[in-house]
A protein has these predicted regions:
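Structural motif
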Residues: 58, 63, 72-73
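Solvent-exposed, charged helical/coil patches
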Residues: 1-45, 105, 116, 122-123
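Structural motif corresponding to alpha-helix initiation and N-cap regions
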Residues: 64-65, 91
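Well-ordered beta-strand positions
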Residues: 49, 69-71, 110
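Conserved catalytic cores of phosphodiester-cleaving nucleases, focusing on short active-site segments
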Residues: 25, 70-84, 97
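Nucleic-acid nuclease catalytic cores
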Residues: 81-123
Length: 123
């Protein structure tokens, strides 16, 4: 059986998301969940960047940019959504983020009426 990439860190991040959901519940805008996650990341002394801009280049020319919700410990991209389910465009989005950032692991978490759902995406 193969070992998960950044297993301990990813489970800590997922635990934070569940903690925030358990305290806030469902029904808020994504930005409020993100702000609560910032508080919890700080409590856990995790190094993170929020709304990280990643530029996309072609032949040394800037052709676009992405804004990642979180990069945690310079290892994991965390993308948070408030939605009913996972959508294909969300998966494509986080894969693009991983490719552009050069990071190996992304966590796509969605906040639903029924709770938290998440996927670990490996680049």
């Amino acid at each position: 059986m193969s070992k998960l990439i950044y297993e301990d860190l990813s489970y800590k991040i997922i635990g934070i998301i569940f903690k925030v959901y358990n305290k806030l519940g469902y029904g808020y805008h994504e930005k409020y969940y993100q702000r609560a996650i910032v508080i919890e990341l700080n409590k856990e002394n995790l190094n993170f960047t929020r709304e990280k801009e990643i530029r996309l280049s072609y032949q040394n020319e800037n052709i676009g940019k992405y804004f990642l919700d979180f990069i945690i410990e310079n290892k994991i991209v965390l993308e948070l959504k408030v939605a009913n389910s996972f959508y294909p465009q969300d998966m494509k989005q986080i894969l693009s983020y991983l490719k552009a950032s050069g990071l190996k692991l992304g966590i796509l978490a969605i906040i639903t009426k029924g709770g938290i759902e998440y996927k670990r995406i490996v680049n």
